[in-house]
Amino acid sequence: MASSVMSSAAVATRGNGAQASMVAPFTGLKSAASFPVSRKQNLDITSIASNGGRVRCMQVWPPINMKKYETLSYLPDLSDEQLLKEVEYLLKNGWVPCLEFETEHGFVYRENNKSPGYYDGRYWTMWKLPMFGCTDATQVLAEVEEAKKAYPQAWIRIIGFDNVRQVQCISFIAYKPEGY
């Protein structure tokens, strides 16, 4: 019993060369008061609420004569250079490029079902076969040009298909007919 009782002063005063490099055991979290506070301590509730006086809010999509095609369809049409970069990104990720076209409705619409979350126009006609093994973005753009010649009044989109996960990873409009 006497050997298990020991004075903490005796342990602390004993100096040894090996103990000098030892790390002190974890003693818990330190008080938050020792850390510098960089945020403003304002408990006034009126300062939290704001109508965004200096912030310009984003407007909603105008519903009249503005058709929605894809997720980012509010952006301007892609130039040939931007289209080439998108296809290079698609190929760099190992996705299989595939072209689809739609001659009647290139936009979201409801005809067969009125429930929320459902819309027609999701499935387009495939242009030829998926381009398995394609490594050159200019080949994909050459197919887009060929599809434009065959169907000048059609919407054409490029999708990137991951054949390992069996999912579509990217989709964007490559061509819209005149007037859209």
Swiss-Prot record:
It is found in: Plastid, Chloroplast. Its main location: plastid. RuBisCO catalyzes two reactions: the carboxylation of D-ribulose 1,5-bisphosphate, the primary event in carbon dioxide fixation, as well as the oxidative fragmentation of the pentose substrate. Both reactions occur simultaneously and in competition at the same active site. Although the small subunit is not catalytic it is essential for maximal activity. One of its GO terms (cellular component) is chloroplast. This is Ribulose bisphosphate carboxylase small subunit, chloroplastic 3. It holds the Pfam family RuBisCO_small. GO terms for biological process: photorespiration; reductive pentose-phosphate cycle. Heterohexadecamer of 8 large and 8 small subunits. The basic functional RuBisCO is composed of a large chain homodimer in a 'head-to-tail' conformation. In form I RuBisCO this homodimer is arranged in a barrel-like tetramer with the small subunits forming a tetrameric 'cap' on each end of the 'barrel'. It comes from Solanum tuberosum. Belongs to the RuBisCO small chain family. Residues 1-56 form a transit peptide. InterPro entries: RuBisCO_ssu, RuBisCO_ssu_dom, RuBisCO_ssu_N, RuBisCO_ssu_sf.
